């Protein structure tokens, strides 16, 4: 199971460099990332495989992980409508998507309110 980590750094130059350098030096592959800023803060979601190791490395780099959750990581076709079809199946089954972003290799990362039910649908 892949983990999505969330940290909320100050909005300043070098935060993502520090993240990438710390992960790289520790041999951690960042498989996906979503980052945005507002009101002086950033919100960064990072997709990793080795959750425990990544948590230790991010903490040592001064990146305070605020949340971690299991996420679905789906290989999807790189074509129009592929994401919509998956999201429609979940919606029709009343599974709420709470977070979504694309990761490397046309993979869709979804955090949902019922991960077990979602697994059976996708």
Regions found by a protein language model. Name each.
Residues 1-122:
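A conserved regulatory-domain signal marking ACT and ACT-like small-molecule sensing domains
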């Amino acid at each position: 199971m892949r983990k999505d980590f969330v940290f909320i750094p100050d909005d300043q130059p070098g935060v993502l460099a520090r993240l990438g350098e710390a992960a790289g030096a520790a041999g951690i592959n960042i498989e996906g990332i979503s980052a945005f800023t507002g009101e002086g803060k950033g919100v960064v979601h990072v997709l990793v495989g080795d959750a425990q190791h990544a948590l230790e490395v991010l903490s040592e780099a001064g990146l305070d992980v605020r949340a971690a959750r299991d996420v679905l990581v789906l290989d999807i076709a790189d074509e129009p409508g592929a994401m919509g079809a998956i999201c429609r199946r979940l919606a029709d089954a009343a599974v709420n998507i709470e977070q979504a972003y694309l990761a490397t290799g046309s993979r869709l990362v979804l955090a949902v309110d019922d991960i077990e039910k979602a697994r059976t649908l996708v």
